[in-house]
Amino acid sequence: MKLSYIDSKYFEELLSLEINPILKNKLISDMCRINILYMICYAGSGHIGSSFSSIDIMNWALGELNKNYEKLYFFSSKGHDAPALYNSLIAYGKLNFSLLSKLRKIDGLPGHPDINTPNIFTNTGSLGMGISKSKGIIKANRLKGINSKVIVLTGDGELQEGQIWESLNRVSQEELNELIIVVDNKKLQSDRTVKITSDLGDIENKFKSFGIETVSCDGNSVEEFSKAFESIESRKKPGAIIANTVKGFGVSFMHGDLLKEGEFYKFHSGSIAQEIFDKAILELNNKITKSIYESKIKFDFKLSFNDSPDIAKKDNIQQSLLSSYSNSIVNEARKNKKIIALDGDLVLDTGLIEFEKKFPERFIECGIAEQDMVSQAGTLAKEGFIPIVHSFSSFLTARPNEQIYNNSTEETKVIYSGFLAGLLPSGPGHSHQAVRDIASMSGMHNLEMIQPNSEKQVEKLLKYSLESPNNIYIRFCSIPFELPDNFDELSEIKKGFGNTISDGKDICILTYSPTILSEAIKSKSLLLKNDINPKLISMPWLNTFDNNWIINELNNFHLIIIEDHYIEGGVAEKLALAISKLDLNIKIDVIGITEVPKSGTNQEILDYHGLSYKKISEKIMGLIKT
């Protein structure tokens, strides 16, 4: 893909000019928009819409407001606008320009802000925490005797998180006058309007009801935003600015306010095609050139060009569990009218579009409110329905963990479908990498954990989940992966039984993740060259193991369990406990994640954490030698 960007020297030149700060901000913001597109398309993923809506505010905060305070903290709580924040920091010389081509690379910029990046103060990506963190910053600086100002940028979708409203309770009471909350009120979250997902009502008066001085303005007009900020600042009280923005602002055909009823927004996340990139760059380039001409300032710039890395094409047939799940849940819902699907603002990412179309009365959109969603599911189950709760695994198993436990104590049945499970995709970063979900769901009463390893297993395991009397957590890999053509012939769904994919001797490799299984299969080829012939087992059951199967399939083997999870709290601990109760000759070693997962390309991260097929082979050979 042919990409264009604006070199750092033009930002430096523009910043050196003595011109109207509002004009300067407009020019810098549109120049940043060009570089945001470059950054996201070079990386292959990122969030364009949210970055475009907030870049004007970010540049005003970092470029102008930063001059007015002894110590200014500005950060975004919503995280999706990381490319905007990075480009703003680059524009003002607070990040190295070379990082423009390093988004979602292991040696560059993570998908969501992380404190290991220069001038990033706090980690974001898990929503709802920003105001609480701001309060802690203010109190810490008061104790140190430092005058500080904290500006936290939140999203309107983020306002659905319960922690937001908890964090507002004592802001006025504690006179946290150093705090200004800015809401990026673009009226779109993810792919649909906030009104459809979870209508927020009168946001301004909600904030006012907490005793917070609140005004609204056009958040994409720096003139209006600067006046709103001055108005709030002059009141010497905790403040909030409802910045009414447009998702995708700056490129006319990306504007979210053009969305028609029933449509999905196309520029929430991901890269874009060459022709769309070229069209957007042309519009931004013309807009910047026109502003320079009309303002008669002595400034000129040129675009630079670069090719994005080629994405390697896969030769083998790839499995996609999402489409299989989408079809399977619709098929089961046709047969069983008690099935209810609950969604946490991830209808595209959890395969529920067709379900919503075909069974709108049995589809419940809960927005970004996992605790509320899980508790609703609990009482739906008590009333005789079969609720299936959907979200990303990292969010579904952590934030509403207490609610899940409460449901389990009521002896009802709820199915929890968690997507984006495991280390990959690694681009979004550790807030989205579910590598502690198995540990989080352990200890739940009457809860089985399962993970399908193929499209056909999705169908079978969903059917099993609906028939089982227990609560079920289904752990879904969300990226395509490769498996042998005969995988489904070799695998069956029998409770507590693993599936032998390839016979071997002495060594047995067991894993439950399809992405890791794919790597393990490739590692066998390398191991065979070193006269090591491992048996390979795919295990769809994460906390249920049949004793007879263990005896027949694992006894007298050196068992190497590969986790797509932290080693602590993973499947290996559970399987080792089951083995310890039997009088068997099994040596156990575990390969898995031992530190906070990195953000980067999938291959980079597999290599870094020792889970690529080459690293697996090296580790196994090392284990055998010892």
Predicted regions and their residues:
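Thiamine diphosphate
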Residues: N96, K105-E178, V347-L420, V435, N548, ...
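General beta-strand structural signal in soluble alpha/beta enzymes
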Residues: S50, S76, V152, S216-D218, ...
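Cofactor-binding active-site loop characterized by glycine-rich and histidine/acidic residues
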Residues: D7, M39, S51-Q173, K494
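Active-site pocket-lining segments that scaffold enzyme catalytic pockets across diverse folds
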Residues: A43-L62, L321-R334
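N-terminal capping segment at the start of a domain
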Residues: S29-S45, D184-K186
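Non-catalytic terminal/interface segments that mediate subunit docking, oligomerization
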Residues: S295-P387, S394
